[in-house]
Design a protein with these regions (language model features):
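Glycine-rich, Arg-bearing micro-motifs that act as flexible, cationic patches
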Residues: 19-20, 117-136, 155-156, 266-292, ...
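Short beta-strand elements of ligand-binding domains
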Residues: 116-119, 144-150, 297-301
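A short acidic, glycine-rich active-site loop
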Residues: 65-74, 208-224
Length: 312
């Protein structure tokens, strides 16, 4: 059930074009709010709706700042009513500063176990839709981050879970199963198989038959592990079903191809801290994917991830 008891939803507010003194929620933020309320219902989690407003220019008065804050709080008030109607315990907060920084600080202060934010804009080109706030959260936030992209299509959704057969990959499988149950989606557990000994085998003049046997054995072992790991989850409770897929190739290419082939709506993937550089993604797999993703994404940090953001 996600294992979430405290959930933080980042609420992006934009000025109402007909009344610039009032704020409203853009479509991607509405999607994030909806996902937050669903997770709150599903996991009986408390939800905090946090809106971060940009500091006013130098010279602005305290009254002007207070007026902007009050407008933001008024825009958030309706979310409390929505949450109450669905039996979700919720609260709202307004902060001033950089969105990604204040969201991470709130996670560090109050121990939120998941962050959900909206994308930049569903109509934006796919390589840009994540936006700078989402990118920084995916890289730096210590808890799982769900970047929700609005989807108007009425079809059964598909969730791809990229499992690298590590502990963080197992966490991704559990989250993917929970998301599939939540969204009534089908699940694809995916592993990009590698052949680490192939270069050595070629160097010692192994025969084509030996190389083929090595590849087949490696794939079979990976498939066995992936099925065993999926069996450790509640995948049988997914109404639309679950399956595994083993594909040879560079992980980011394999994942992107699977997303396109299956028209995936959500990718669940792990990130790994690069040695000595806190907050970076390793192996370029996740970094490459961030530039090409066309679906929503949940990014999971490994145990021991070092968040470079510190509380004052």
């Amino acid at each position: 059930m996600f294992g979430v008891r405290k959930l933080l939803v980042g609420v992006d507010l934009v000025a109402n074009p007909e009344n610039p003194d009032r704020f409203e929620l853009p479509a991607p933020t509405r999607e994030a709010v909806e996902m937050g309320l669903r997770v709150g219902e599903f996991s009986q989690a408390g939800v905090t709706f946090l809106s971060v407003i940009e500091p006013l220019p130098a010279g602005a008065t305290e009254d002007e700042q207070a007026e902007v804050t009050a407008s933001a709080q008024a825009a958030l008030a309706g979310l409390l009513s929505e949450a109450a109607e669905r039996g979700v315990q919720a609260e709202t907060q307004v902060a001033s500063g950089h969105g990604w920084m204040e969201i991470i600080r709130e996670v560090l202060r109050n121990g939120h176990q998941m962050v959900i934010v909206g994308s930049r804009d569903a109509s934006t080109a796919s390589r840009l839709w994540l936006g700078s706030t989402a990118i920084k959260l995916l890289r730096l936030c210590p808890c799982p981050v769900w970047v929700a992209r609005s989807n108007d299509e009425e079809k059964t959704q598909t969730i791809v879970v990229a499992d690298d057969l590590t502990d963080v990959g197992q966490h991704c499988l559990h989250l993917g199963v929970s998301a599939a149950r939540l969204l009534h989606a089908r699940l694809l557990a995916l592993h990009a198989v590698q052949y680490p000994l192939e270069r050595h085998l070629r160097r010692i003049d192994s025969s084509p038959e030996e190389l083929r046997e090595y590849r087949e054995t490696t794939c079979a072992e990976a498939e066995k592990q992936l099925n065993e790991r999926l069996a450790m989850t509640d995948f049988r409770t997914i109404s639309e079903g679950a399956r595994t897929e083993i594909t040879a190739g560079r992980p980011d290419v394999v994942i992107q191809d699977a997303i396109e082939e299956h028209e995936a709506d959500l990718l669940v993937m792990g990130t790994v801290a690069r040695g000595g550089i806190p907050g970076m993604l390793v192996g370029n797999t996740a970094e490459r994917l961030l530039n090409s993703l066309s679906c929503s994404v949940i990014a999971v940090k490994p145990e021991g991830f070092v968040c470079p953001v510190q509380l004052d």
